[in-house]
Amino acid sequence: MLDLEQEMSRCRVCPRKCGADREHGKTGYCKAPSGVTAARAALHFWEEPCISGTTGSGTVFFSGCNLRCVYCQNHHIAEMESGKVISIGQLSDIFLELQAQNANNINLVTPSHYVLQIREALLLAKEKGLTVPIVYNCGGYESVEALQALDGLIDIYLTDFKYMVTSLAKAYSRAEDYPETAKRALAEMVRQTGRAVFDENGLMKKGVIVRHLLLPGAVKNAKAVVKYVYDTYGDTVWLSLMSQYTPLPQVENISPLNRKTTKREYERLLDYTFSLGVTNAFLQEGPVAEESFIPEFDGRGI
């Protein structure tokens, strides 16, 4: 199993395995220090209905990212422009406070580069009475070894599967190995949680949701993702097909990322999805590409 002290001195937690000495102030691709850095902890109502429910998901947004996609919708925290360093004890207390606010679950957003610290915080919080499900909300670019360090602690994996087209993974996320890496990670997630389980109120208690944000001009890539996931896992996992891509200023000169996804592009993806026989899927309706989906990373709850 990965060791926190060793990994922080030569970080190999994520698939980039860049070897940064985070313990002594050096940072790698994710830009994260050794101390957990978070930008917001609050109830969040914009996840899938089975995650947010009516009382909200207790969401912790971590700063830094091992992908840092050029079109990132949360680029302020991905680039470490906001966030506060907190201790493992403080993080465990944040989990308990969110539970006290009647959160349906604890939702860890972009947690990959803090896996080992999060493991310690979860163990501590569970000793103090944390009982709600734990959601690991990630970009899909995960090390199997890091995921195994969380085995038994994570109830729900809410993972992106961004690319099956290698050229897009390289151009947009500088991760040419994304497709194969995401396949291995997803297999480990499904191994840990098994088939999705819901309670009487429709809230997910255990399982995997695979998200795909349809990018402009990338219907072929999206279809390939859906086909792979459904061919491999069938109804064991749920798909979440999103059309809310919002072109932000950093991509104003990058075509086709400088436009919204069209209604027709999304309809083509849905038609294909239904033609495969997919039934376990969350879809979006109406005009949803708005910056209102992007929360304020103002340090609330940290």
Q: Where are the regions a protein language model picked out?
A:
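Auxiliary Fe-S-binding modules of radical SAM enzymes
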Residues: 1-27, 194-302
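Conserved Radical SAM active-site core
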Residues: 30-156, 165-166
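Hydrophobic faces of well-ordered beta-strands that scaffold small-molecule active sites
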Residues: 58, 106, 134-136, 157-159, ...
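Conserved radical SAM core fold
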Residues: 78, 115, 140-143, 161-179, ...
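Alpha-helix N-cap and loop-to-helix initiation/capping positions
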Residues: 86, 113, 173-181, 217, ...
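Aromatic/hydrophobic pocket-lining residues that form the small-molecule binding cavity
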Residues: 91, 118, 182, 186, ...
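Alpha-helix-loop-beta-strand connector modules within alpha/beta enzyme cores
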Residues: 122-133, 184-189, 263-269
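Anionic-ligand binding region
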Residues: 170-201
